[in-house]
Amino acid sequence: MATTKVTRNRRTASRPSKRRSPGATHVVIIGAGRGGTALMEIFANDPLVRIVGVADISDQAPGLGLAKRLHIRVTRNYRQLLKMGPVDLVIDVSGNPEVGEYLQDIRRMGVSVIGGASAKFMWQLI
């Protein structure tokens, strides 16, 4: 009598795959205030965007609850975002100048970055 091996899918929604989703732009968002929350709401149902992670220094940032409901990884340390999986685009809506300095190095690694005046302009469009 043949036996069937049953395997369980160990990947859960709270632990997204580190593999690249074909055709999707892999995005991380720095800042989970109003701007970051609005971006998550827009990107959440877009099949061409996969939000890899969200960072905010405040545990009380309004967007963190939304990120958790959407099964998006969250961190207080924005430097951890690039370790969460493949990243094509970083969007900085934190308003923190220190983050902008760090993102200059990220650009050199070939990752696209939207921050500063560009992020402010995008926020005004939303």
Residue map of PLM features:
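NAD(P)-binding Rossmann-fold cofactor-contacting core
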Residues: D46-L70
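N-terminal Rossmann-like NAD(P) cofactor-binding module of classical short-chain dehydrogenase/reductase
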Residues: V90-D92
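A short, basic/flexible loop-to-alpha-helix module at the beginning of a structural domain
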Residues: A2-A24, R79
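Conserved acidic residues
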Residues: V52, P86-D88
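Short acidic-hydrophobic, aromatic-tinged amphipathic segments that line or gate anion-handling sites
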Residues: R73-Q80, I114
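Glycine-rich adenosine-cofactor-binding loop
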Residues: T25-E41
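Rossmann-fold NAD(P)-binding glycine/threonine-rich loop
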Residues: P97-I126
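Phosphate-coordination loops involved in phosphoryl transfer and adenosine-cofactor binding
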Residues: G23-H26, V87
